[in-house]
Amino acid sequence: MLSNKAQNSGDPKAWRIKGDQSRWWTQPLLILAGIALGLSMPLAGADNFGTDVADAFKNGTFNVGFRYRYEFVDWDARTKDANASTLRTRLVYKTAPLFDTFLTLNMDDLRPIIGSNFNDTRNGKGQYPVVADPKGTDLNLASLTFTGLEGGKIVLGRQRINRENQRFIGTVPWRQNEQTFDSLSIDYAFTDKFKAFYSYVDRVKRIFGPDDPLPTLPTQALSANFSSNSHLLDASYTFSPLFRLKGYAYLLDLENDLLPSPTPLSIGLGTSDSFSSQTLGLRLTGKQDLGGDLNFSYAAEFAAQQDYADNPNNYDENYYVVEAGLDWAKFGFKLGYETLEGSGVAGESFQTPLGTNHKFNGWADLFLVTPPGGLEDLYIQGTAKALGGKFSLIYHDFSPQTGSGDYGSEIDFVASWSFMKNYSVLAKFALFDGDNNISDINKFWLMLSADF
């Protein structure tokens, strides 16, 4: 349904679906999902249905994983350094398929061990830098997956959604508690070359859960959940290995559960609806074998974002990135330039509230939220495989997109090893050197993982 503004105005921005009126067309999708699941169940097997269900659970698979991480943060803006020692225990159960449908359950438990000298966004230890791994037990997956569609699948329930490189939509797997989505998703390959995806998102389970912060803490912006009435749509066509084009439309109608509009956010983004946005974009990627173990790859992307639904801000900002890389034998090199525009006014910059933002713009996490003046990031990366492990070194130079001056520069490094199939170890650091009175920050991680 179009807003009155759209019906009576020539303004192109007015021709948008109202965020609070778009649920009407998600109901048929839910009905279709139910019909698809129902049609997959042969009537002849109705008498044995109870037995079949029992067998599906009996023949299911169970996995357990442990991930220990030590994180050290030295931030000049805080009086004390953070030392976080946490253990995540993950339990995953998946039923055997029944009528092309299976159930997935994932429970994560996160506990500080040895010590808790850090601000986990919940414990009130504001004298320490933030390490966003709060204590708690969370049901991160509870979904039904139907695979009876040739070339496609339907997923209903709490699920992981990772689109492309996770710049806009991702699960933030680096944090101990993942971001997951209560949604209905349809993933379909029309041909080997043409693929499409749609998801309606009703709620976002964020990395800060499962508990909300206390009302007395200045972290109300970091609620455990986003209420959502959002639509995610993308489609890609592969012309050749050198040319793959992807288009997307991400209509995010998000509301912070703790901050009924128009309560101000502590991070300067306005009200609880300030993360709502409409993003339309195109991404071109490709790779080419140059011979002699030498391979070339590239990416070029442009996206336009504007306010959406009940976002009180009125903005229209762009995003673009160009990237080129060369891989030779066990070595790689990449050069890239990324821009997220900003007008210089709080709440009027290009944001990616559902992205895996730790992957981008430096691992020190200074730019998880784009500053009002926007962000330009020139980066160089080198990778190598040696000594049985993988190594990566990245240099970033950060500056505002609007105005003059610099934010600073950063050096990131990671080394990782996998062994005996089930085990891995990772060491990683980030060194941010701030300019123009922006505080320096240094981070170090040591992580041990075991999955069975």
Per-segment meaning from a language model:
Residues 71-87, 97-143, 148-149, 154, ...:
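Surface-exposed loop and membrane-interface regions of Gram-negative outer-membrane beta-barrel proteins
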Residues 112-114, 129-131, 308-319, 323-325, ...:
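C-terminal outer-membrane beta-barrel translocator/porin domains of Gram-negative envelope proteins
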